[in-house]
Each structure stands twice: as structure tokens, then as C-alpha cells.
């Protein structure tokens, strides 16, 4: 009985962690290879896709599938690059997830979680639903031991030469408690 419970707990923790829409649920491809991330992680990197936004489950899932296909087919990544992707519908989509190294920020992938917002946030503000989803994901990440309690949030632009996560999203996360201004 104890072994069955442990197996069930591990399955639930990995596949449905923090209310994330799993790859199976958004019809994602299986990664070609995985490398495990040392946890808990101290750094969270926020990005944007610079694509159109989405507000429905179907539209967001399609964009996530398109990103995964582009990353795997054109960039030769093992999987979608981001750890998580957040839609304007307020849902968080599984990318590399909490357990696997992503391919989102050169030089930082093995020591961070990359969270990407679907849309272009240079001129548009992210939806309140998407911001609430990020807060809930981060809170859950700490509770489940994926993130350190004193984790830091940075914008992609702070680490490489890019406008990501866009001016409006960057200005939003700069006001958050865990933001690291460097």
C-alpha cells in the first residue's frame, strides 16, 4: 500500500504540479532528450514570445504547439525552450517544467526557470489573469520545493541583449518583491 501511494504521489507531483496544463493536455511532443535541473532553483527569468496574444484555451495551446515545433524543428532544441508558458487566458502551459533544463537564456539554463508570456508586451499590458497565474505558479514553486523561498525574478533583457519581456511586462515585474534589479 505504501509503495502505491508513493508512486501515485510522484505521478501527481510531476504531471499536474501547480495546476499547469501538461504537455499531454496541450498535445505537445515528447522531448528528444532531457537533462535534469538541480532544485531548488533561485532564479526565474521572465520573457515574452513577441507573437500575437491568446485568450482562449484552443488559441493558446496552438501557439504553444507552434513554438515547440519551431524550437525542435528549426533550432534543434530537445524540447520547447521555456520552462513554462503563460497565456492571456490565465493558464500556465508546461514546457521543460520544474524538473528539466530549458533552452531559454544562454548561460543561465542550468540554474534557472524560464517563464514566457504569450504576446508582445512592448506596448500592450499583460492580462491580469496572466499576472495572477505567474504569481500562483511562483508561490506553488516555493511550496513544492522547486524554487528557493528567496528566489529572484529578472527580465530576460537583464541577462542578454533583447527587449524581452517587453517594456510593459518588465515595468510590472520590477514592482514585485522578488525582483532583482542589477
From Swiss-Prot:
MF terms (GO), sorted A to Z: N-acetylmuramoyl-L-alanine amidase activity; peptidoglycan binding; zinc ion binding
SMART domains linked to this entry: Ami_2, PGRP
CDD domains cross-referenced by the UniProt entry: PGRP
Signal sequence coordinates: 1-16
Tissues expressing the protein: Strongly expressed in fat body with weak expression observed in hemocyte. No expression detected in gut.
Domain N-acetylmuramoyl-L-alanine amidase: 39-166
Keywords carried by this UniProt record: Disulfide bond, Immunity, Innate immunity, Signal
Function: Binds specifically to peptidoglycan and triggers the propenoloxidase cascade which is an important insect innate immune defense mechanism.
Complex formation: Monomer.
Protein family (similarity comment): Belongs to the N-acetylmuramoyl-L-alanine amidase 2 family.
Protein name, per record: Peptidoglycan recognition protein
Taxonomic source organism: Trichoplusia ni (Cabbage looper)
Gene of this entry: PGRP
Amino acid at each position: 500500500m505504501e509503495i502505491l501511494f508513493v508512486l501515485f504521489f510522484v505521478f501527481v507531483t510531476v504531471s499536474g504540479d501547480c495546476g499547469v496544463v501538461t504537455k499531454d493536455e496541450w498535445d505537445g511532443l515528447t522531448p528528444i532528450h532531457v537533462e535534469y535541473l538541480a532544485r531548488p532553483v533561485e532564479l526565474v527569468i521572465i520573457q515574452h514570445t513577441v507573437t500575437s496574444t491568446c485568450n482562449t484555451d484552443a488559441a493558446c495551446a496552438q501557439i504553444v504547439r507552434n513554438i515547440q515545433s519551431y524550437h525542435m524543428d528549426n533550432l534543434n532544441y530537445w524540447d520547447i525552450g521555456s520552462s513554462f508558458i503563460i497565456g492571456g487566458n490565465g493558464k500556465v502551459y508546461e514546457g521543460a517544467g520544474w524538473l528539466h533544463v530549458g533552452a531559454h537564456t544562454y548561460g543561465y539554463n542550468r540554474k534557472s526557470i524560464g517563464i514566457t508570456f504569450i504576446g508582445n508586451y512592448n506596448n500592450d499590458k499583460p492580462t491580469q489573469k496572466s499576472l495572477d497565474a505567474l504569481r500562483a505558479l511562483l508561490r506553488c514553486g516555493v511550496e513544492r520545493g522547486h524554487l528557493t523561498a528567496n528566489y529572484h525574478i529578472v527580465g530576460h533583457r537583464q541577462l542578454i541583449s533583447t527587449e524581452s519581456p517587453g517594456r510593459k511586462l518588465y515595468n510590472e515585474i520590477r514592482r514585485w518583491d522578488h525582483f532583482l534589479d542589477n
